[in-house]
């Protein structure tokens, strides 16, 4: 799965690999002021957004199967902007910075989710691999509220996908009003 569509549209450098998922090669956000330096993602026209949206439209036009798209969750996108390690550490050291970055990334995620819905998606999958780094308490402060904002923004089901060891977080996941859960080990 490609978690770099939103980050690339924000101007972050992406390294594409032949046989693996793309990597974000720089995490430029160190302070809330750095958010203003990011590129305007221009949802739905910037970066590779049009490719994703056209794929959804094509699937809907040529098939009766349900079509859905992937989104980097607000916390995962914030982790790409700051680095997963920095966002995780700063949940304890600088929660105000985390919330500023999360507010910004949530707007991008919500706009992309709405664009996918407008393109005809029957559902979206909110990819949240970074949440497995958090305790349940930190999840409920720094992930859950932003997942809820995405769910509230669209009128289609949102499936929450979380990678890694998630057993400790399952009670938190069920508090999120998502249409489905996809857990990975």
Predicted regions and their residues:
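Active-site loop segments of alpha/beta catalytic cores
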Residues: 41-185
């Amino acid at each position: 799965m490609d978690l770099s569509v939103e980050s690339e549209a924000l101007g972050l450098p992406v390294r594409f690999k032949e046989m693996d998922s793309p990597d974000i090669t720089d995490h430029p956000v160190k302070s809330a002021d750095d958010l203003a330096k990011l590129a305007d993602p221009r949802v739905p026209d910037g970066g590779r957004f049009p490719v994703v949206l056209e794929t959804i439209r094509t699937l809907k036009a040529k098939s009766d199967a349900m079509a859905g798209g992937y989104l980097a969750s607000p916390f995962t996108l914030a982790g790409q902007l700051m680095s997963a390690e920095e966002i995780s550490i700063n949940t304890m050291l600088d929660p105000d910075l985390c919330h500023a970055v999360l507010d910004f990334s949530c707007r991008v995620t919500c706009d992309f989710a709405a664009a996918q819905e407008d393109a005809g998606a029957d559902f979206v999958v909110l990819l949240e691999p970074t949440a497995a780094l958090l305790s349940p308490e930190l999840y409920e402060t720094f992930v859950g509220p932003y997942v809820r904002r995405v769910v509230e923004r669209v009128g289609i089901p949102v499936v929450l996908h979380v990678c890694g060891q998630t057993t400790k977080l399952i009670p938190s996941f069920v508090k999120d009003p998502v249409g489905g859960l996809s857990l990975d080990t």
